[in-house]
Amino acid sequence: MAAPEVQYLSSGDTALTVQFGTVIERELNSRIVALGHSIAKAAIPGVSETLPTYRSLLVNYDPLVLSRDQLVARLQPLVDSPPDADDAAPARWQVPVCFDSELAPDLAHVAGASGMSEAQVIKAMLDVTHHVYMLGFAPGQPYICLLYTSDAA
């Protein structure tokens, strides 16, 4: 992955968006998540939280503690340096799922549309590790990457 162009965009008076290009890629998102961890470890006074998205990181800060320019100056070295292995390592979660027809009403539709049996769809869903790009919009709603490289499911 080539180094993306980084832009610092004001998001109101208390947030800064660190935007990495225009494409959505798993490797890029992993870098963004790692940057959020690096910022937390740096404990920059005035920074209250970071929120990763597909291709950017929102940094919330207190402008009474540090200015936008001061924040960019503190972030730039973190953006420019490769993430620590600990920061880049993804968290792993095992999530229980239920494919009961009452709780998964679209299972039959997905099976029919993909030409797979319901059992094959379930197996396909469970045989992959899902990468969560971000949580958001609906609280706690995971946004996961493309699951399949074929037209199945």
Residue ranges and their predicted role:
Residues 83-89:
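Conserved short beta-strand edge segments in small beta-sheet-based binding/regulatory domains
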Residues 148-153:
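Conserved small/polar residues in nucleotide/adenosyl-binding loops
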Residues 52-53, 91, 105:
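Short glycine-enriched loop/turn motifs at secondary-structure junctions
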Residues 14-16, 55, 93-95, 128-130, ...:
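Structural beta-strand/beta-sheet cores of well-ordered domains, especially the beta-sheet scaffolds
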Residues 97-147:
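Anionic-ligand-binding alpha/beta catalytic cores of soluble enzymes and soluble regulatory domains
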Residues 46, 82, 128-132:
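Short secondary-structure junctions and interdomain/linker hinges
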